Amino acid sequence: MEFLVNGASVYDESGVMVSFEESEDNIIENFRSDDLLRELIRENRIFIEDFSSTNGFESGDYSLEALFMRLDDAIKRVGAKRIVLDKVDNLFSHFEKKAIIRSELLQLIEWLNSRGLTSVFTTGENPYGGAAHGLEEYVSDCVIHLKHRYKDHIGTRYMTIKKYRGSEHGLNEYPMLINSKGLSLFPITSLRLDYTVSRRIVSSGIPELDNILGGGFYQWSSVLISGTSGTGKTSFVAKFAYEACERGERCLLFANEEPADQIIRNMASVGIDLEKFSSHNLLIHSERPTTLGLEAHLTAMQDLVREFEPDHVIIDPISSLTEAGFGVKDLFVRFTDFLKNRKITSILTYLTEGGSPLTTTEIHLSSLIDTWVILQQVEKGGYYANILRVLKSRGLKHSKKPVEFKLTSKGIKILGGE
């Protein structure tokens, strides 16, 4: 349906939906969240031809002439350039001989092609994972396979291009998300390393930290702030977000463990008034990755980035993504590449478990990170002091000297910064 709706609304190509399973009323009801479909039907740019209750093709000498007559009328009615035949396997369900099915399919495709139509067929699946009759794939120029897989009781949809004549298409499985805004795909391979880099430096929001970093962070770079629980990781990224919004820049904060109101309340205790920008420039989106599954979660994040168009993206924390296990690094590489290609600075926090080395992450992110700031607590004279050090900052002359910092009601205070 998205093929038809976008065709009519974006490319000015009217279309026909031919349904061999669902009634017209059911189709419209199933897409009731999309008012655009109803509008396009009213404007005579999309027409639904309902064959769901037709049994005239199922007896006597089989002929497609009656089908062609109805299709021809529907095509002319809207001046269609696109056509979808939904559950076309139902049309041939009473045939057992594959030779007849193949012949009729070819006749149908040739008839549609002769009218200059781009046609999409959908079909069910046989027990072996192929198309229902096992022949649809052979007579089609492009074959797209959809599947639904479960891991740890969480379902994720995937799309695979099994065949596309004349095209160097991808061969991998592409995670797919369907929501009220349509269908979204998450790229299965990293984007090419040809994105534009910036030489502009943006402030961390803390002048003393900027001095340690050699001026701040490079715009459009990826920054990691890691540390054990209670070291102030969220406070550092919240301060960055506050100062970015003060400059009129847009900031999108993905909170994976806390609701937005709780973050705003907690940050107020360290002198960071995020509520000031909550109605503009700053968007805090709270959702646990386990709600959808990692692939679907990152796809939803990708969609929100496109919609909000931020200058900076914060993910707090990314360590919650590691619960997805195998493949998480590959998925995250794609997401960070997606941000860099859109010229977005990314600030990530990572919770280091007690006893784990401070200079490693469970998903081995070091190669993806341009600047890495480590926060830790060290026993000092009967109390625990918060210590900050910069592990690396590519392209900037930074200090590696550890410095102490404090979280106060007036903000983050770095002691002895250069």
Model-assigned labels for residue ranges:
Residues 1-29, 187-264, 268-270:
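The Walker A/P-loop phosphate-binding site
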Residues 3, 32, 130-134, 146-148, ...:
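Short beta-alpha junctions and helix-cap segments that line functional grooves
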Residues 11-14, 43-44, 116-117, 139-142, ...:
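Short glycine-/polar-rich loops that comprise or flank the Walker A/P-loop
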Residues 11-93, 249-330:
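Conserved inter-motif catalytic segment of the P-loop NTP-binding fold
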Residues 16-18, 47-49, 120, 144, ...:
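Hydrophobic/aromatic beta-strand patches that form the interior of the parallel beta-sheet core
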Residues 21-25, 33, 52-56, 89-91, ...:
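Conserved nucleotide-binding/hydrolysis micro-motifs of P-loop NTPases
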Residues 53, 69, 73-78, 148-207, ...:
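Conserved P-loop NTPase
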Residues 61-138, 143, 293-372, 376, ...:
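P-loop NTPase motor core
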